[in-house]
Amino acid sequence: MTNEELSQLLEPAIADLGLELVGIEFSPNSGTSLLRVYIDEPERGITIDDCERASREISALLDVNDPVAGRYTLEVSSPGLERPLFTPAHFERFAGEQARINVNLPIDGRRRFQGRIEAVDAERVTIEQDGKPVQIAHANIAKARLVPDYAALGLAPAQPARPGAKAPAKRKRGIE
């Protein structure tokens, strides 16, 4: 079963929970495959309880319909800060944001792009990379994710000291 067919199977059950199916990633493996289902609730975000409820519903559907051959692990999660972008609507929603896009077929000899999402239509997304527009057909996108600005979110690690810089003086404690 394709990811699109899985989405069609799961979307109504997830919508009944008041949640949105963001997308599905299936990673086949010779041992146990991984089926990752991303859910969201745009107004308030996702809680662990939402993931648990969705996981129970999805598991029940998968047990009845058995769309995945072999053994697999089901993982239900929020999209997170490095949110995957699966559809043209996702790119539209995050226009102006930074995205990292991997393509199936090289464009000008490259398979990886990162830039600001400038424009989106039914056929392609345009990003600005290094000051130049790059048009990428939706059908050529292998994987796309947002690139969060961790510094703006206050989540960036402290900048390391310059090489050769002196360490701050330590104060000695003791009895004088």
State each model region's role.
Residues 1-176:
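Short Lys/Arg-rich amphipathic alpha-helical segments
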